[in-house]
Amino acid sequence: MTEAGAKKAAGKKSGKGKGKNAKKNQPNITPVAENRKAKFRYEILDSVECGMMLMGSEVKSMREGKLSLDEAHIRVTNGELWLVGSDIAHYNNAGMWNHDPRRPRKLLVHAKEFDKFAGRAFERGLTLIPLRVYFSERGLAKCVMGLVKGKKLHDKRETIKKRESDRGLQRAMRRK
């Protein structure tokens, strides 16, 4: 074995350097888009992570941050979950192979989670909405779906009052 080959083999055995565990310790999950109004408009009861079926131009556009979840919701149709009302802008370099910005997108979820969420989504007053969209460590598009209940006006006011009182407490604690 040559000297360079011996160093290479020794480096692998020692376990130093970058390996599979290097990424696991530092998750880099930055959201592409968040539904910021969801916490204000709805009471979030439960959430689950699901995959998204996307076209190539949609993925590239999402990586540029051109995704809006403002009017989006999730519909259950024929035993499948569909993200409806989200807007992924056209990708500039896609040319004639671009996607429809408002098309419904299929969400992928395990059967047990589907049964749990789809069954509860049909209860009165509950709905499914996307809370956050991001790319996983493997580069897959993921959507965090939430089972929510709409807040009344007085509930929203309570939330605002609670938030303001918490801020006041934080300010008082910093002064001491």
Curated annotation (Swiss-Prot):
Subcellular location per the Swiss-Prot or TrEMBL entry: Cytoplasm
GO function term, MF aspect, one: RNA binding
GO CC, one annotated term: cytosol
Annotated Basic residues bias: 9-23
InterPro entries recorded: SmpB, SsrA-bd_prot, SsrA-bd_prot_CS
Keyword Protease: no
SUPFAM superfamilies: Small protein B (SmpB)
Keywords tagged on the record: Cytoplasm, RNA-binding
Keyword Cytoplasm: yes
Gene Ontology biological-process entries: trans-translation
Pfam families, sorted: SmpB (PF01668)
Region (Disordered): 1-33
Family: Belongs to the SmpB family.
Family annotation (PANTHER family): SSRA-BINDING PROTEIN, TMRNA-BINDING COMPONENT OF TRANS-TRANSLATION TAGGING COMPLEX
Function, in words: Required for rescue of stalled ribosomes mediated by trans-translation. Binds to transfer-messenger RNA (tmRNA), required for stable association of tmRNA with ribosomes. tmRNA and SmpB together mimic tRNA shape, replacing the anticodon stem-loop with SmpB. tmRNA is encoded by the ssrA gene; the 2 termini fold to resemble tRNA(Ala) and it encodes a 'tag peptide', a short internal open reading frame. During trans-translation Ala-aminoacylated tmRNA acts like a tRNA, entering the A-site of stalled ribosomes, displacing the stalled mRNA.
Protein name per its UniProtKB record: SsrA-binding protein
Organism the protein comes from: Rhodopirellula baltica (strain DSM 10527 / NCIMB 13988 / SH1)
